[in-house]
Amino acid sequence: MFNQQRYKQSREAASRASRILFSLGFILLLSASDASAQALDVKIKVVPGTPQRVRVEGRRAESATAWSIRNFYGSAAGLAERVENFQLFGEDGAAVVVKKLAPGEFSAAGPAARFSYDFKLDPPAFVSDSSHVSWLTADRGLLMLADLLPVPLTNAKVELSIPAGWKVATAEARNASGVFEVADAERAVFAVGRDLKERRARAGAMSFTLVTAGDWAFTEEEAADSAAEILKIHQETTGGAPRQSPHVVMLPLPQAGAAGNLWSAETRGATVVLVSGRLPSKLAAKAQLDGALTHELFHLWVPNGLALEGEYDWFYEGFTNYVALRAGMRRGQLTFHDYLNALGSAYDSYRRARGPREVSLPEASQRRFAGSGALVYHKGLLVAFLYDLTLMRQTGGKNSLVEVYRELFRRHGRGEQPADGNRAVVAALGSAGGMRAFVERYVEGSTELTLPSLIEPLGLRVEPGGARTHVGVSDSLDSAQRELLRKLGYNERPDAESRKLHERLRKRSSQ
């Protein structure tokens, strides 16, 4: 259920490092000169053919001589290499000579306000990039303004032209003239295609729109019901609904012959994108959908609902893995035994990924796309688990990680003054129930996670024997431990199977 494709790890990071530094340096140079973020008026036209492409024409609010189009997004590289026929014009429409300095980096001979170019939008080579970048097929696609328009971006007015018979679905507002008025172009996503279907539904206090295309083993109603249940649970966790009614977009993977168990997901602003392979079994397909949505829908709140900045991926990805695990248990997707198995699996993955020395969670986030992606997800999940249970134990079950999330939204909900994400989250975690020392050691610090000793006070243990880590319940529990585990779904009778497994493993290890 926790598909390994979910982990957005880097590829070819070392060979790209110098190019990344060049691109970042050039963008910083632009922001310090005459390319400050400003409004755009643009027209994007989907042009059928091979390869699939869009034509982009537009105008900046103010003229500039330095122009840039994003070339990297996370682990996706070479995005600006898809740009062709890049041209610039003055306010009077006269052409301005332009020089290409590097992929996506252009210098104009004089001030230019108008621009035009073609963008090839073949599907990305890697399945894991399919939810993160713009692409088109003959039937459908994703258009993401963050990689289509000149950067840096603020707001934009977007006129979208699509082939006859196609539809567009987006969370962005459309005015009476049919033009989309985009308040934050970095977060804007447009799904386009000839077979798009929209279904509006409610989840507790909020409404949402499910956008689907293609054929799936489950029905649209079943997908909408899953999304509604998960959204309702996440509302209860955070204490409120997102500020904007979300769109949940489900599209088939655009790569021909992609395996059915592969998928990629991302949340930008109020849009959740899930691009997935198609499994023939309804049971397997529904389990894959539920697993993906349980994690990804929480991103509508964290980080997208918080006014926090910086690289605190360890929290909004790693801790979200734990929140998804608990939500899956509440829905009945996962049992208490599944919960323990997931922790054992995460511990094994953490030990494989930690390398020759331990690093703090903030440091792992800084290096996420340079080899530390697994630490962000697996160590983040483990620290969230240990934090949650330790806080519950110290407060007699009165406080948990849920209270930390609610406090974050009280202090730093979107609309508040932007703050540094690492500082804000560390402060919130450390202020709860005597958890300051825990946070200093396992979040800010680089203390190794030794699971057997850390879970013993919680009434859990690592089972002996076997190549993989198995977490089980201790033979003897005190009343506080028993009550703590019951809050997580532990039931002594069903857990008899786990005790039998422990006994078999103990005997095997002693032979």
Annotate each PLM feature:
Residues 21-31:
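Bacterial N-terminal signal peptides
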Residues 78-85, 89, 153-169, 181, ...:
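Zn2+-dependent metallopeptidase catalytic core
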Residues 1-16:
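N-terminal secretory signal peptides that target proteins for export/translocation
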Residues 70-73, 117-197:
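Extended, low-hydrophobicity, Ser/Thr/Pro/Gly-biased non-transmembrane segments
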Residues 308-382, 394-395, 406, 410-415:
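Acidic/His/Gly-enriched intrinsically disordered linker/tail segments
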Residues 197-312:
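Juxtacatalytic substrate-recognition/specificity segment
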Residues 46-47, 75-132:
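A surface-exposed beta-strand-loop module
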